[in-house]
Protein backbone atom coordinates (compact mmCIF):
# COMPACT_ATOMS: atom_id res chain seq x y z
CA UNK A 1 0.00 0.00 0.00
CA UNK A 2 2.01 2.93 -1.31
CA UNK A 3 0.52 6.26 -0.19
CA UNK A 4 0.11 9.51 -2.10
CA UNK A 5 2.01 12.16 -0.13
CA UNK A 6 0.47 15.65 0.08
CA UNK A 7 2.79 18.47 1.13
CA UNK A 8 0.96 21.77 1.39
CA UNK A 9 1.43 22.82 5.00
CA UNK A 10 4.40 24.13 6.94
CA UNK A 11 3.07 23.12 10.35
CA UNK A 12 1.31 20.16 11.98
CA UNK A 13 -1.96 18.97 10.46
CA UNK A 14 -4.99 19.63 12.70
CA UNK A 15 -7.87 18.16 10.65
CA UNK A 16 -8.57 16.54 7.29
CA UNK A 17 -12.03 16.01 5.81
CA UNK A 18 -13.55 14.61 2.61
CA UNK A 19 -16.57 16.13 0.93
CA UNK A 20 -19.67 13.92 0.53
CA UNK A 21 -18.65 12.45 -2.83
CA UNK A 22 -15.05 12.01 -1.76
CA UNK A 23 -13.49 13.63 -4.83
CA UNK A 24 -12.11 16.49 -2.70
CA UNK A 25 -10.01 16.39 0.45
CA UNK A 26 -9.78 19.50 2.67
CA UNK A 27 -6.79 19.90 4.99
CA UNK A 28 -6.02 22.45 7.72
CA UNK A 29 -3.01 22.82 10.00
CA UNK A 30 -1.33 24.98 12.63
CA UNK A 31 -0.56 27.47 9.84
CA UNK A 32 -3.12 29.90 8.33
CA UNK A 33 -3.53 27.89 5.10
CA UNK A 34 -6.63 25.90 4.11
CA UNK A 35 -5.93 23.51 1.22
CA UNK A 36 -8.21 21.49 -1.05
CA UNK A 37 -6.91 18.51 -3.05
CA UNK A 38 -8.14 16.03 -5.63
CA UNK A 39 -8.24 12.80 -3.63
CA UNK A 40 -7.77 10.56 -6.67
CA UNK A 41 -4.26 11.78 -7.51
CA UNK A 42 -3.22 14.20 -4.75
CA UNK A 43 -3.20 17.28 -7.00
CA UNK A 44 -3.71 20.53 -5.12
CA UNK A 45 -6.82 22.24 -6.43
CA UNK A 46 -6.52 25.47 -4.48
CA UNK A 47 -5.97 27.38 -1.26
CA UNK A 48 -8.32 29.49 0.87
CA UNK A 49 -6.36 32.49 2.13
CA UNK A 50 -7.50 34.84 4.89
CA UNK A 51 -6.84 33.34 8.31
CA UNK A 52 -4.00 34.77 10.39
CA UNK A 53 -3.59 31.94 12.91
CA UNK A 54 -3.67 28.17 13.22
CA UNK A 55 -6.79 26.62 11.67
CA UNK A 56 -8.37 24.00 13.95
CA UNK A 57 -11.36 22.76 11.96
CA UNK A 58 -12.87 22.52 8.47
CA UNK A 59 -16.14 21.27 6.97
CA UNK A 60 -17.86 21.22 3.57
CA UNK A 61 -21.63 21.27 3.07
CA UNK A 62 -23.74 18.52 1.45
CA UNK A 63 -23.30 19.70 -2.17
CA UNK A 64 -19.76 21.11 -1.70
CA UNK A 65 -20.77 24.70 -2.49
CA UNK A 66 -19.44 26.17 0.73
CA UNK A 67 -16.53 25.51 3.08
CA UNK A 68 -16.44 26.45 6.78
CA UNK A 69 -13.24 26.94 8.80
CA UNK A 70 -12.48 27.84 12.43
CA UNK A 71 -9.21 29.31 13.61
CA UNK A 72 -7.09 30.44 16.54
CA UNK A 73 -7.28 33.96 15.06
CA UNK A 74 -10.68 34.19 16.85
CA UNK A 75 -12.77 33.81 13.71
CA UNK A 76 -15.00 31.39 11.82
CA UNK A 77 -15.06 31.93 8.05
CA UNK A 78 -17.38 30.84 5.26
CA UNK A 79 -15.90 30.32 1.78
CA UNK A 80 -17.13 29.70 -1.74
CA UNK A 81 -15.69 26.25 -2.45
CA UNK A 82 -15.15 26.74 -6.19
CA UNK A 83 -13.72 30.28 -6.30
CA UNK A 84 -12.07 30.48 -2.86
CA UNK A 85 -13.86 33.77 -2.15
CA UNK A 86 -14.54 34.57 1.51
CA UNK A 87 -18.31 34.93 1.93
CA UNK A 88 -18.55 35.62 5.66
CA UNK A 89 -16.31 36.46 8.61
CA UNK A 90 -17.68 35.73 12.09
CA UNK A 91 -15.47 37.15 14.84
CA UNK A 92 -15.30 35.51 18.27
CA UNK A 93 -13.69 36.27 21.64
CA UNK A 94 -11.53 33.13 21.64
CA UNK A 95 -10.26 30.45 19.26
CA UNK A 96 -12.80 28.44 17.25
CA UNK A 97 -12.19 24.76 18.01
CA UNK A 98 -14.95 22.92 16.11
CA UNK A 99 -17.32 23.81 13.26
CA UNK A 100 -19.81 22.15 10.93
CA UNK A 101 -22.74 22.43 8.51
CA UNK A 102 -26.05 20.78 9.28
CA UNK A 103 -27.59 18.16 6.99
CA UNK A 104 -29.23 20.75 4.70
CA UNK A 105 -26.26 23.12 4.64
CA UNK A 106 -28.39 26.03 5.88
CA UNK A 107 -27.29 26.16 9.51
CA UNK A 108 -23.72 26.31 10.79
CA UNK A 109 -22.47 25.72 14.30
CA UNK A 110 -19.09 26.36 15.88
CA UNK A 111 -17.66 26.15 19.37
CA UNK A 112 -15.10 28.46 20.96
CA UNK A 113 -12.37 27.75 23.49
CA UNK A 114 -12.45 28.61 27.18
CA UNK A 115 -9.50 31.01 27.36
CA UNK A 116 -8.45 34.56 28.25
CA UNK A 117 -11.33 34.88 30.71
CA UNK A 118 -13.96 33.92 28.13
CA UNK A 119 -16.07 30.82 28.57
CA UNK A 120 -16.78 28.18 25.93
CA UNK A 121 -19.83 28.82 23.71
CA UNK A 122 -21.57 26.93 20.91
CA UNK A 123 -23.03 29.36 18.36
CA UNK A 124 -25.68 28.60 15.70
CA UNK A 125 -26.19 30.76 12.59
CA UNK A 126 -28.87 30.38 9.91
CA UNK A 127 -27.27 31.23 6.55
CA UNK A 128 -30.73 31.99 5.08
CA UNK A 129 -30.92 35.06 7.34
CA UNK A 130 -28.25 37.54 6.14
CA UNK A 131 -28.82 39.81 9.16
CA UNK A 132 -27.41 37.14 11.51
CA UNK A 133 -24.17 37.06 9.50
CA UNK A 134 -23.95 40.83 8.96
CA UNK A 135 -24.55 41.64 12.64
CA UNK A 136 -22.60 38.62 13.95
CA UNK A 137 -25.69 37.68 15.97
CA UNK A 138 -26.36 33.91 16.19
CA UNK A 139 -29.94 32.77 16.60
CA UNK A 140 -28.77 30.65 19.52
CA UNK A 141 -25.70 30.62 21.76
CA UNK A 142 -25.17 27.85 24.31
CA UNK A 143 -22.74 28.48 27.22
CA UNK A 144 -20.63 25.55 28.42
CA UNK A 145 -19.62 26.53 31.92
CA UNK A 146 -18.06 23.36 33.26
CA UNK A 147 -15.72 21.94 30.62
CA UNK A 148 -14.81 23.24 27.18
CA UNK A 149 -15.86 21.41 24.01
CA UNK A 150 -12.93 19.71 22.25
CA UNK A 151 -14.86 17.98 19.45
CA UNK A 152 -18.37 18.31 18.02
CA UNK A 153 -20.46 17.03 15.09
CA UNK A 154 -24.04 17.38 13.90
CA UNK A 155 -26.30 14.51 14.91
CA UNK A 156 -28.84 12.67 12.72
CA UNK A 157 -31.05 14.93 10.55
CA UNK A 158 -29.54 18.06 12.07
CA UNK A 159 -31.79 17.92 15.12
CA UNK A 160 -28.92 18.11 17.60
CA UNK A 161 -25.16 18.32 17.93
CA UNK A 162 -23.01 15.74 19.69
CA UNK A 163 -20.18 17.33 21.67
CA UNK A 164 -17.18 15.82 23.44
CA UNK A 165 -15.63 17.72 26.35
CA UNK A 166 -12.23 18.19 27.96
CA UNK A 167 -13.53 16.30 31.01
CA UNK A 168 -14.47 13.20 28.96
CA UNK A 169 -18.20 13.95 28.97
CA UNK A 170 -20.44 13.50 25.92
CA UNK A 171 -23.44 15.79 25.44
CA UNK A 172 -26.29 16.01 22.99
CA UNK A 173 -27.52 19.60 22.53
CA UNK A 174 -30.83 20.40 20.84
CA UNK A 175 -30.30 22.57 17.74
CA UNK A 176 -33.69 24.21 18.36
CA UNK A 177 -33.78 24.93 22.10
CA UNK A 178 -30.14 24.51 23.12
CA UNK A 179 -31.01 22.26 26.05
CA UNK A 180 -28.91 19.22 26.93
CA UNK A 181 -30.89 16.20 25.70
CA UNK A 182 -28.51 13.45 26.84
CA UNK A 183 -25.36 13.49 28.97
CA UNK A 184 -22.99 10.55 29.48
CA UNK A 185 -19.45 10.14 30.79
CA UNK A 186 -17.78 7.03 29.38
CA UNK A 187 -14.28 8.54 28.96
CA UNK A 188 -12.04 9.57 31.85
CA UNK A 189 -10.02 12.14 29.87
CA UNK A 190 -10.41 14.62 27.01
CA UNK A 191 -12.33 13.52 23.89
CA UNK A 192 -10.30 14.62 20.87
CA UNK A 193 -12.33 13.26 17.98
CA UNK A 194 -15.91 12.32 17.09
CA UNK A 195 -16.79 10.84 13.69
CA UNK A 196 -20.18 9.56 12.55
CA UNK A 197 -20.92 6.42 10.57
CA UNK A 198 -22.16 6.77 7.00
CA UNK A 199 -25.80 6.26 8.07
CA UNK A 200 -25.34 8.55 11.10
CA UNK A 201 -26.79 5.84 13.35
CA UNK A 202 -23.60 5.53 15.40
CA UNK A 203 -20.36 7.38 15.99
CA UNK A 204 -16.86 6.69 17.27
CA UNK A 205 -14.97 8.79 19.81
CA UNK A 206 -11.25 8.86 20.58
CA UNK A 207 -9.86 10.04 23.89
CA UNK A 208 -6.62 10.66 25.75
CA UNK A 209 -7.60 7.83 28.11
CA UNK A 210 -6.14 5.32 25.58
CA UNK A 211 -9.50 4.19 24.20
CA UNK A 212 -11.74 4.70 21.21
CA UNK A 213 -15.44 3.95 21.82
CA UNK A 214 -18.54 3.34 19.73
CA UNK A 215 -21.86 4.98 20.67
CA UNK A 216 -25.45 5.06 19.46
CA UNK A 217 -26.14 8.49 17.88
CA UNK A 218 -29.64 8.86 19.30
CA UNK A 219 -29.32 7.54 22.85
CA UNK A 220 -25.51 7.95 23.35
CA UNK A 221 -25.53 4.37 24.60
CA UNK A 222 -22.01 2.92 24.76
CA UNK A 223 -21.61 -0.08 22.41
CA UNK A 224 -17.94 -1.05 21.96
CA UNK A 225 -14.45 -0.16 23.26
CA UNK A 226 -11.15 -0.32 21.35
CA UNK A 227 -8.18 -0.29 23.74
CA UNK A 228 -4.66 0.72 22.70
CA UNK A 229 -1.36 1.43 24.41
CA UNK A 230 -0.41 5.04 23.65
CA UNK A 231 -3.08 7.75 23.66
CA UNK A 232 -5.37 7.21 20.66
CA UNK A 233 -6.55 10.67 19.86
CA UNK A 234 -8.64 10.14 16.71
CA UNK A 235 -10.75 7.49 15.01
CA UNK A 236 -12.90 6.95 11.90
CA UNK A 237 -15.46 4.35 10.78
CA UNK A 238 -15.32 2.53 7.44
CA UNK A 239 -18.43 3.17 5.28
CA UNK A 240 -18.33 -0.36 3.77
CA UNK A 241 -16.94 -2.71 6.39
CA UNK A 242 -17.17 -3.21 10.13
CA UNK A 243 -13.77 -1.60 10.57
CA UNK A 244 -12.44 1.26 12.70
CA UNK A 245 -9.14 3.02 12.07
CA UNK A 246 -7.55 4.75 15.06
CA UNK A 247 -4.44 6.92 15.16
CA UNK A 248 -2.40 9.04 17.52
CA UNK A 249 0.86 8.29 19.26
CA UNK A 250 3.13 9.73 21.88
CA UNK A 251 2.81 13.44 22.68
CA UNK A 252 4.50 15.72 20.15
CA UNK A 253 6.85 17.20 22.79
CA UNK A 254 8.45 13.76 23.28
CA UNK A 255 8.75 12.86 19.62
CA UNK A 256 12.30 14.11 19.01
CA UNK A 257 13.72 11.57 21.44
CA UNK A 258 11.53 8.69 20.31
CA UNK A 259 11.85 6.24 17.41
CA UNK A 260 8.76 5.72 15.25
CA UNK A 261 8.51 2.14 16.52
CA UNK A 262 8.46 3.06 20.22
CA UNK A 263 6.26 6.12 19.69
CA UNK A 264 3.49 3.99 18.13
CA UNK A 265 2.82 6.45 15.32
CA UNK A 266 1.02 3.95 13.08
CA UNK A 267 -2.67 3.79 12.21
CA UNK A 268 -4.36 0.72 13.68
CA UNK A 269 -7.36 -1.13 12.29
CA UNK A 270 -9.91 -2.79 14.58
CA UNK A 271 -12.93 -4.97 13.85
CA UNK A 272 -16.06 -3.13 14.92
CA UNK A 273 -17.89 -6.11 16.41
CA UNK A 274 -15.02 -8.13 17.89
CA UNK A 275 -12.98 -5.14 19.16
CA UNK A 276 -9.78 -6.86 17.97
CA UNK A 277 -6.90 -5.27 16.09
CA UNK A 278 -6.15 -6.86 12.71
CA UNK A 279 -3.74 -4.48 10.96
CA UNK A 280 -1.40 -1.49 11.15
CA UNK A 281 -0.16 1.09 8.66
CA UNK A 282 3.10 2.95 9.28
CA UNK A 283 4.47 6.03 7.56
CA UNK A 284 4.19 9.23 9.58
CA UNK A 285 7.18 10.55 11.49
CA UNK A 286 5.41 11.69 14.62
CA UNK A 287 1.84 11.36 15.92
CA UNK A 288 -1.14 11.12 13.58
CA UNK A 289 -3.43 14.08 14.24
CA UNK A 290 -6.39 13.29 11.97
CA UNK A 291 -7.81 10.35 10.00
CA UNK A 292 -10.71 10.07 7.55
CA UNK A 293 -12.15 7.26 5.43
CA UNK A 294 -13.00 7.98 1.80
CA UNK A 295 -16.81 7.78 1.39
CA UNK A 296 -16.41 4.80 -0.98
CA UNK A 297 -14.36 2.90 1.62
CA UNK A 298 -11.56 2.06 -0.84
CA UNK A 299 -9.00 4.39 0.74
CA UNK A 300 -8.32 6.45 3.83
CA UNK A 301 -6.20 9.50 4.60
CA UNK A 302 -4.15 10.54 7.60
CA UNK A 303 -2.62 13.87 8.61
CA UNK A 304 0.35 14.01 10.95
CA UNK A 305 2.43 16.14 13.25
CA UNK A 306 5.06 16.04 10.48
CA UNK A 307 2.86 18.32 8.31
CA UNK A 308 2.20 15.66 5.66
CA UNK A 309 -1.12 14.19 4.56
CA UNK A 310 -1.03 10.62 3.26
CA UNK A 311 -3.74 9.12 1.05
CA UNK A 312 -3.67 5.31 1.37
CA UNK A 313 -5.45 3.20 -1.26
CA UNK A 314 -6.15 -0.28 0.06
CA UNK A 315 -4.58 -3.34 -1.59
CA UNK A 316 -6.90 -6.06 -3.01
CA UNK A 317 -6.10 -8.25 0.02
CA UNK A 318 -7.92 -5.78 2.26
CA UNK A 319 -11.22 -6.37 0.45
CA UNK A 320 -10.74 -10.16 0.42
CA UNK A 321 -9.86 -10.34 4.13
CA UNK A 322 -12.40 -12.11 6.34
CA UNK A 323 -12.11 -11.74 10.09
CA UNK A 324 -12.54 -14.95 12.06
CA UNK A 325 -13.27 -14.56 15.75
CA UNK A 326 -11.85 -17.18 18.09
CA UNK A 327 -14.29 -18.88 20.38
CA UNK A 328 -13.74 -18.44 24.10
CA UNK A 329 -11.43 -21.14 25.41
CA UNK A 330 -10.14 -22.15 21.97
CA UNK A 331 -6.36 -22.38 21.48
CA UNK A 332 -4.72 -19.23 20.15
CA UNK A 333 -2.16 -20.82 18.11
From Swiss-Prot:
Biological role: Component of the eukaryotic translation initiation factor 3 (eIF-3) complex, which is required for several steps in the initiation of protein synthesis. The eIF-3 complex associates with the 40S ribosome and facilitates the recruitment of eIF-1, eIF-1A, eIF-2:GTP:methionyl-tRNAi and eIF-5 to form the 43S pre-initiation complex (43S PIC). The eIF-3 complex stimulates mRNA recruitment to the 43S PIC and scanning of the mRNA for AUG recognition.
Modified residues annotated as Phosphothreonine in this record: 219
Keyword Nucleus: no
Subcellular location: Cytoplasm
Family, similarity comment: Belongs to the eIF-3 subunit I family.
UniProt PTM comment: Phosphorylated by TGF-beta type II receptor.
GO biological process, one term: formation of cytoplasmic translation initiation complex
GN (gene name): EIF3I
Electron transport recorded as keyword: no
UniProt cross-references to PROSITE patterns, sorted A to Z: WD_REPEATS_1, WD_REPEATS_2, WD_REPEATS_REGION
Alphabetized GO MF terms: RNA binding; translation initiation factor activity
Main location: cytoplasm
Residues found modified as N6-acetyllysine: 264
Keywords tagged on the record: Acetylation, Cytoplasm, Initiation factor, Isopeptide bond, Phosphoprotein, Protein biosynthesis, Repeat, Ubl conjugation, WD repeat
Name of the protein described by the UniProt record: Eukaryotic translation initiation factor 3 subunit I
InterPro entries hit by this protein: eIF3i, WD40/YVTN_repeat-like_dom_sf, WD40_repeat_CS, WD40_repeat_dom_sf, WD40_rpt
WD repeats by residue range: 8-47, 50-91, 144-183, 186-225, 283-324
Cross-link (Glycyl lysine isopeptide (Lys-Gly) (interchain with G-Cter in ubiquitin)): 282
Provenance organism: Oryctolagus cuniculus
Subunit structure: Component of the eukaryotic translation initiation factor 3 (eIF-3) complex, which is composed of 13 subunits: EIF3A, EIF3B, EIF3C, EIF3D, EIF3E, EIF3F, EIF3G, EIF3H, EIF3I, EIF3J, EIF3K, EIF3L and EIF3M. The eIF-3 complex appears to include 3 stable modules: module A is composed of EIF3A, EIF3B, EIF3G and EIF3I; module B is composed of EIF3F, EIF3H, and EIF3M; and module C is composed of EIF3C, EIF3D, EIF3E, EIF3K and EIF3L. EIF3C of module C binds EIF3B of module A and EIF3H of module B, thereby linking the three modules. EIF3J is a labile subunit that binds to the eIF-3 complex via EIF3B.
Cellular component annotations (GO), alphabetically ordered: eukaryotic 43S preinitiation complex; eukaryotic 48S preinitiation complex; eukaryotic translation initiation factor 3 complex; eukaryotic translation initiation factor 3 complex, eIF3m
Residue(s) carrying Phosphotyrosine: 308
Amino acid sequence: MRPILLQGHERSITQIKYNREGDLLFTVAKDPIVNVWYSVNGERLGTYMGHTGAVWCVDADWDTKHVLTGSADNSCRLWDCETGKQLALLKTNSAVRTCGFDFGGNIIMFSTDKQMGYQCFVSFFDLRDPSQIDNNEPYMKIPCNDSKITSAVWGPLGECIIAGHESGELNQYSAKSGEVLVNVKEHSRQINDIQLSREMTMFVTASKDNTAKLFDSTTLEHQKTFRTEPPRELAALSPNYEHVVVGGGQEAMDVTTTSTRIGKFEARFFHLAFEEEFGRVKGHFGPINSVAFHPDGKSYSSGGEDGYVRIHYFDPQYFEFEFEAREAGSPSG
